[in-house]
């Protein structure tokens, strides 16, 4: 296994974290800073950078290394043209690619999915305080699309508060307000992010006769009034299982790049329009990650 990072301090921290865990004597891990130090062929690469450098890293990687499978972190890219450029690059190099929106892997969302009548519209709402609307909406859109059984959506950004906020990640921005999502079968998703710490995390899903409430921070859901615990897996508990699935079967349950790319582009176009109106400038990129 190899771990690459341009910042030596981050590599040292990663090594420390790895060695604090239960080390597998059958594994060898390398800590690298340059793509040129990688082997010429790799079975699986996870690109877990922020959004701005991701396409450049992807291009540099595929120019030097034959990669069979890649997992990309969201938010994928900051510019709309990046998505088609990346798609062409991935197709030319015959790479299997997925995007890490891991709620699809949570057992309780799989259970909810089995309850949903896909012939009826789904009504989903998510409200919380300062949860990173720009950064994290794609997670909610992704699980909404899985549950609704839809592949395309439109979105209305009229409810965004026209004030640019600094993201907790340096060099990136955020907005508060609401985004409303609509699919062809009439399913809707309302995403609300407020600057009010008294507002409690709330996710609701209504479909047919089912009324479901999910509270991820407190670890429970209520299905038609019946409350039950849910297990929120950490990323560290998920990555190994996903990697095994990809390496053994050549596939996994994460969203493919080509599907997630479409979800990203609709959201990015909408939030970029808001960003340009608020700043009074014509940016071709919106710095969200």
What are these regions (language model features)?
Residues 27-41:
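Short acidic low-complexity segments
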Residues 18-20, 44-49, 245-289:
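C-terminal helix-rich "cap/oligomerization" subdomain common to oxidoreductases
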Residues 14-15:
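Conserved SAM-binding loop
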Residues 44, 55-102:
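Beta-strand-loop-alpha-helix segment that lines the small-molecule cofactor/substrate pocket
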Residues 37-57:
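Rossmann-like NAD(P)-binding element
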Residues 124-198, 258-261:
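Rossmann-like dinucleotide-binding domain that binds NAD(P)(H)
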Residues 169-174, 182-246, 250-258:
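NAD(P)-dinucleotide binding in Rossmann-like oxidoreductases
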Residues 2-7:
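Short, small-residue-biased leader/transition segments that mark boundaries at the very start
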């Amino acid at each position: 296994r190899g771990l690459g990072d341009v910042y030596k301090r981050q590599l040292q921290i990663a090594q420390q974290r790895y060695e604090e865990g239960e080390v597998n004597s059958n594994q060898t891990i390398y800590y690298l800073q340059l793509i040129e130090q990688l082997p010429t062929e790799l079975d699986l690469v996870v690109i877990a950078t922020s959004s701005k450098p991701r396409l450049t890293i992807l291009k540099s990687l595929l120019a030097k290394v034959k990669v069979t499978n890649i997992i990309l972190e969201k938010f994928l890219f900051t510019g709309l043209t990046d998505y088609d450029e990346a798609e062409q690059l991935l197709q030319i190099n015959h790479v299997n690619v997925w995007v890490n929106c891991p709620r699809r892997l949570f057992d309780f969302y799989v259970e909810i999915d089995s309850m949903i009548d896909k012939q009826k519209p789904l009504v989903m709402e998510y409200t919380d305080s300062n949860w990173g609307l720009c950064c994290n909406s794609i997670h909610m859109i992704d699980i909404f699309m899985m549950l609704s059984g839809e592949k395309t959506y439109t979105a209305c950004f009229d409810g965004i508060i026209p004030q640019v906020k600094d993201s907790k990640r340096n060099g990136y921005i955020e907005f508060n307000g609401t985004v409303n999502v609509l699919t062809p079968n009439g399913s809707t998703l309302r995403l609300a992010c407020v600057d009010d710490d008294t507002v409690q995390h709330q996710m609701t899903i209504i479909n047919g006769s089912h009324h479901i409430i999910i509270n991820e921070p407190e670890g429970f859901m209520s299905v038609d009034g019946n409350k039950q615990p849910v297990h929120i897996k950490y990323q560290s508990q998920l990555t190994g299982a996903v990697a095994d699935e990809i390496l053994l079967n050549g596939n996994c349950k994460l969203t493919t790049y080509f599907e997630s790319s479409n979800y990203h582009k609709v959201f990015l176009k909408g939030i970029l329009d808001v960003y340009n109106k608020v700043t009074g400038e014509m940016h071709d990129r919106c710095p969200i990650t």
